[in-house]
Amino acid sequence: MCCPLYAQKENSNAASLKKYNSSNNNRAGKHLFIDVHHLGPGKITYEGVAEAHAKDLAVERKYGVEFIKYWVDTARGTVYCLSSANDTESIIKTHAAAHGLLPDHIYSVTEGTEAAVNGGKNLFLDIHELGAGNVTAGDVAAAHQKDLAVQKKYGVNFINYWVNEKDGVVMCLSEAPDSSAVIKTHKEAHGLIPKYVLEVKQGQ
């Protein structure tokens, strides 16, 4: 899925958000990955990414890949794709065959337990870059519980998170009134402030 074709006029209607437990896609012998495409401001639209995603879905089985969800940050021109695959090479081959738009980074990740989407609020993906060897999945699980304990105070609903232990990268998906609410929740819960808080639209 993951990369846009050409910039078009963006549809203001947000894609419908559906609860989907992606852990069901982490089948025997496969792993979860998030691949990231940096196209640049003004270079993508949600509609363009959706078209590219459809092309990925048309060829993914050939390479043993299952694209689960994707998130689009049109302001920065960045796309994040969640998939289940045997390895990173399979993801690259799928994108190459589908539309030729290759990811800049691919992270092998573990995820938390997905919560229900409430709807009616903006969707945010916040990124923590903690450094190689500085975080474990267990650490993030504990921090996530602290987030859940205080999130209502700021009107936030944390939906899920993904951890790459090798590079020390954590990505958290949430619904919130604004980015400051996400930051305030993290700050009060455990003090770990994200490097980026991106407003995104989700597709699958």
Residue ranges and their predicted role:
Residues 3, 7-62, 66-68, 72-77, ...:
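Short S/T/G/P-rich N-terminal loop/turn motif that feeds into the first structured element of a domain
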Residues 84, 96-99:
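Generic short alpha-helical segment signal, independent of protein family or function
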Residues 84-90, 175-180:
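Helix N-cap motif at beta-to-alpha junctions
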Residues 91-96, 182-186:
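Charge-rich, low-aromatic oligomerization/scaffolding segments with amphipathic character
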Residues 98-105, 189-196:
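A common structural junction motif
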Residues 196-202:
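C-terminal end-helix/capping segment
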